[in-house]
């Protein structure tokens, strides 16, 4: 009920029905004991009443629109805080329990004080390393992790930063001693807080963080901005200063390019369930079936090619099993940045580490106490190999933690086997300095960092114990280019086309079409875009519009076989067989032996009742393709309706001797009846009824041919009698 009342107030505000919204909010606040909120609302109401009074008196106020926006903004902000305050009293969600416990935090636990503790960590750690047995290490790690945790939770649960909070948060960005991981965690807390409640100061902080020198930090901030705008798409229009800052950030267009990349990464994450399903249902079972082939194949570098050459039969078996294609497809998806590990790691999120929400956001750190506990401070042997794998950009942070905990709990022999499988190359290669530095460089690329962070978020919203307490943006339509504040930033042809093509490749015709139409409206369409728009329309069964698009493509890139073929198909679908035929003939001129084209051209001629010409096409098809039942069927029917009964029967007999369908028995029955072989006709009709699965469907199908039979000279009065013979 609290959410419903709040939503109603917000709807009124969006419709600019400010007076109603304020009176609804007044009633909403009756249940809240928060006097500061009541006072803020009263002030906003009074200001609005004065404003309306001046207007009634005809007083011209050049600042009126600005003031109106400010009152509306203030009303909305009061509504936000009222909603949270009321939910704090009733909700069992983790977020609200955090807010209820905020009072217990000592006052000196502000951002600046926590910053000092975090900044001292690298030095404290260095001192411990000099001590025998790393004395005091546990206490240092614990103090650091608890401080980072308090900063995370207090930031997340603070829905409304004061000017002082904002200043202190800026101090974190400016600090040169703060460990980067702590700043990353703080950036995630700011994003989570914005998801619960819009706060201009936090949004402004993210705009600062996007320009931070460290890639980990600026990429997290970028994803944070995208999330904040997806959660509050229209909100920014009330804050011109924030909109102005966004435009300023994008002066050289680089911000838009980066945000567009995040947009694609978010869309790609929505494909994860499909990939998951493919892994579970196709790839893993296929691997299990082909385990012997896999066992005989050795991937990687061979010292001596003579002794270790592969048995070519294994390669063949591998390819013929279809597994080769599937693995290649997965590799391509992985290179593209798709989340191919979700199904593997989804099972590995039950470790105690993942019970705490903030741990899902902590960048992977070999110096995290939970990792040191399992592997020691300086990993050696297999663990050193593991740490190399963990420096690569193949896994997101959350999966790296899972991997470590899993490795720590399995026997040594299995661990070595798993590691060698995962690297899929000889381990020496990983140890090779040049290769491991290439891996490190890959891991430091902005696109890799942001993509892995999106994978971390995906896991949090899909797998964490408290996932049901959060709005899962991955389940919703993600359309960043439609957010008003991003219109000027993302609605640029070179960016829109990447999103359109992504949807097109992933077979989302409706989404791709909307974007192609936008590109066409921006006068930025070439033949390629009209072709793709046409194809999307065709997929949506909007054939007439598809034809329009294809015709435009044909003007821009004349006589392109693909366009002509699709034009023919669409004309055929709307039963304009004359136009379809015209285009099939154009394709035929370019590809005279294309079997499908011959068949469809013949079919169009048959529909136009030009049977002699149709037969020429079907005979040609029968000549170039041996045992072409499709051609035989067409020849049989065209011969029958054209009065060539012997020829018709000859072809139906060929069909009945190979792989007949119910319709073949039915049509052969027609020919037998027309040539006076009543008994044979009744027998064929009985077989047809059997194949159709009963008299009812048989009679329905027979009824469709009734007119043709009468035209061929069968007496209409005989039809009921024949039906009773069947």
Can you say where each PLM-predicted feature lies in the sequence?
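Start-of-helix register in tetratricopeptide repeats
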Residues: 3, 220, 494, 528, ...
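Alpha-solenoid helical-repeat scaffolds
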Residues: 362-557
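Terminal, low-structured helical/coil segments at or just beyond the last alpha-helical repeat
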Residues: 694-726
């Amino acid at each position: 009920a609290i959410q419903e009342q709040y939503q109603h107030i917000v709807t009124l505000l969006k419709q600019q029905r400010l007076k109603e919204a304020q009176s609804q909010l007044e009633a909403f606040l009756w249940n809240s004991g928060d006097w500061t909120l009541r006072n803020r609302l009263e002030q906003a109401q009074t200001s609005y009443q004065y404003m309306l009074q001046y207007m009634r008196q005809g007083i011209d106020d050049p600042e009126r629109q600005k003031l109106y926006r400010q009152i509306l903004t203030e009303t909305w902000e009061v509504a936000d805080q009222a909603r949270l305050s009321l939910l704090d009293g009733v909700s069992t969600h983790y977020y609200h329990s955090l807010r209820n416990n905020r009072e217990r935090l000592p006052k000196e636990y502000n951002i600046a004080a926590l910053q000092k503790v975090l900044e001292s960590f690298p030095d404290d750690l260095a001192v411990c390393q000099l001590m025998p047995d790393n004395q005091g290490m546990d206490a240092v790690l614990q103090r650091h992790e608890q401080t980072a945790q308090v900063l995370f939770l207090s930031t997340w649960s603070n829905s409304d930063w004061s000017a002082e909070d904002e200043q202190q948060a800026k101090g974190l960005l400016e600090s040169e001693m703060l460990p980067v991981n702590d700043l990353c965690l703080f950036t995630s807390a700011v994003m989570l807080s914005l998801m619960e409640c819009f706060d201009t100061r936090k949004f402004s902080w993210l705009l600062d963080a996007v320009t931070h020198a460290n890639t980990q930090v600026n990429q997290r901030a970028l994803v944070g901005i995208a999330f904040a705008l997806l959660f509050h798409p229209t909100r920014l229009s009330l804050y011109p200063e924030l909109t102005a800052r966004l435009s300023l950030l994008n002066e050289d267009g680089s911000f838009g390019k980066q945000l567009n990349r995040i947009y694609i990464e978010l869309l790609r994450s929505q494909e994860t369930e499909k990939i998951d399903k493919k892994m579970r249902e196709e790839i893993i079972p296929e691997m299990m079936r082909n385990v012997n082939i896999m066992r005989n194949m050795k991937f990687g570098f061979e010292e001596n090619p003579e002794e270790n050459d592969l048995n070519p039969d294994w390669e063949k078996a591998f390819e013929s099993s279809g597994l080769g294609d599937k693995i290649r497809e997965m590799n391509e998806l992985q290179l593209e940045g798709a989340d191919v590990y979700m199904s593997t790691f989804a099972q590995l999120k039950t470790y105690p580490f993942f019970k705490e929400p903030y741990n899902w956001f902590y960048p992977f750190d070999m110096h995290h106490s939970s990792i040191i506990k399992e592997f020691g401070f300086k990993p050696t042997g297999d663990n050193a190999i593991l740490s190399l794998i963990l420096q690569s950009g193949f896994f997101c942070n959350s999966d790296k933690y899972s991997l470590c905990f899993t490795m720590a709990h399995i026997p040594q022999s299995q661990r070595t086997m798993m590691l060698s499988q995962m690297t899929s190359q000889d381990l020496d290669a990983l140890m090779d300095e040049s290769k491991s530095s290439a891996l490190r460089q890959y891991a430091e690329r902005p696109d890799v960092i942001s993509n892995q962070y999106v994978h971390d978020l995906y896991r949090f919203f899909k797998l964490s114990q408290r996932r049901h307490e959060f709005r899962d943006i991955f389940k919703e339509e993600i359309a960043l280019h439609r957010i008003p504040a991003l219109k000027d930033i993302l609605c640029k042809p070179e960016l829109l086309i990447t999103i359109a093509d992504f949807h097109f490749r992933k077979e989302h015709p409706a989404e791709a079409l909307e974007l192609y139409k936008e590109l066409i409206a921006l006068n930025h369409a070439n033949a390629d875009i009209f072709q793709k728009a046409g194809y999307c329309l065709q997929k949506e069964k909007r054939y007439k519009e598809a034809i329009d698009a294809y015709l435009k493509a044909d003007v821009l890139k004349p006589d392109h076989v693909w366009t002509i073929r699709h034009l023919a198909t669409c004309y055929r679908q709307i039963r304009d067989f004359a136009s379809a035929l015209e285009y099939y003939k154009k394709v035929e001129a370019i590809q005279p032996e294309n079997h499908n084209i011959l068949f469809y051209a013949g079919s169009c001629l048959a529909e136009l009742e030009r049977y002699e010409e149709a037969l020429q096409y079907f005979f040609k098809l029968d000549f170039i393709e041996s045992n072409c039942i499709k051609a035989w069927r067409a020849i049989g029917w065209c011969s029958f309706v054209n009065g060539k009964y012997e020829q018709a029967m000859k072809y139906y007999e060929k069909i009945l001797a190979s792989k007949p369908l119910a319709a073949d028995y039915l049509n052969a029955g027609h020919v037998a009846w027309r040539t006076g072989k009543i008994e044979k006709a009744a027998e064929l009709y009985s077989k047809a009824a059997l194949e159709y699965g009963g008299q009812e469907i048989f009679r329905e199908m027979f009824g469709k041919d009734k007119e043709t039979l009468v035209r061929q000279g069968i007496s209409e009065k005989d039809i009921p009698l024949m039906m009773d013979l069947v």
